[in-house]
Amino acid sequence: MKRWNFSNVMLIVGLLFIYLPMLILVIYSFNASKLVTVWGGWSVKWYVGLLDNTQLVSSVGRSLEIAFYTAFSSVLLGTLAAFVLTRIPRFRGRTLFGGMVTAPLVMPEVITGLSLLLLFVAMAQLIGWPQERGIVTIWIAHTSFCSSYVAVVVSARLRELDLSIEEAAMDLGAKPWKVFLLITIPMIAPSLAAGGMMSFALSLDDLVLASFVSGPGSTTLPMEVFSAVR
C-alpha cells in the first residue's frame, strides 16, 4: 500500500482548496431555497429563470463574441511580437519594444482602462472614430493586454526550437514563408493554442477594462453579474 507522504497530502489539500468551492457552488446552484444556508431540495428553477433573462443571455453572447475576436487577434499580434523578440536579436529600440510588449502584464488594469478611455475620447475628437464605445473598443482593449500573454508563451516555445530544422529546410530551397507555415507553425502550435485559450478566458473574465471602454448596449457578462450582485 502506498504511503501518504507530505507531498501527496499537500497536493490533495491544494486540489481541494481550489476545486471544492467550485463543486459546492455547482451543487448549491440547484438549491430550491433562496438562502444559501438552507437546503430546500433539488431544483432547476434558477436555470430556467436565467434563460428567461434576455439581457443576461444577450450579455453572454456578446462576451463570447468579444472573447473569440480577442483570442484570434491576440494570437496573431502576440506571435508576431514573439518572433521579433526571439528571431531579431538586435535592432534599434528593441529594449523599448520588449518593455511595451510585456508592460500590460504588470500594469494595473485600472491604469490601462483609464488610458484607453482617454485615448478613445481623444481619437473621437481628432478623427471622429470611434463615434461611440462598444464591442469594438472592448475588443481593442482586451487585445492590448491579452497579446502580451500570447507573446510570452510563444516566445518561450520559440527559444526551445531547434533552428537547424528551419535552416535545413531553407538549404533545400524552401522559401522563408513556406518554412514558417509548414515547419515553424506546426512546432509552435501547442503554444498558439495555449495562448488562444488563455486570451479567450481572460477576455471572458475581464470586468475592469470593459467597464472603462464599454458603452450603451455593450454590457458584457462580468459587468452584468457585478451589477446584479451589487
Predicted segment positions?
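N-terminal, non-cleaved signal-anchor transmembrane helix
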Residues: 1-54, 58-61, 65
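Interhelical loop and adjacent transmembrane-helix boundary motif
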Residues: 1-4, 34, 47-58, 204-230
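Transmembrane-helix boundary motif in ABC transporter permease subunits
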Residues: 2-3, 68-101, 121-122, 163, ...
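Transmembrane alpha-helices
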Residues: 10, 15-22, 137, 144, ...
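A structural signal for multi-pass alpha-helical bundles of membrane permease subunits
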Residues: 19-34, 62, 113-127, 197-202, ...
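Membrane-interfacial helix termini and adjacent extracytoplasmic/periplasmic loops
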Residues: 35-40, 44-45, 49, 93, ...
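Hydrophobic alpha-helical transmembrane segments of multipass integral membrane proteins
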Residues: 57, 61, 65-77, 81, ...
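Short hydrophobic faces within alpha-helices
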Residues: 60, 85, 103, 164-172
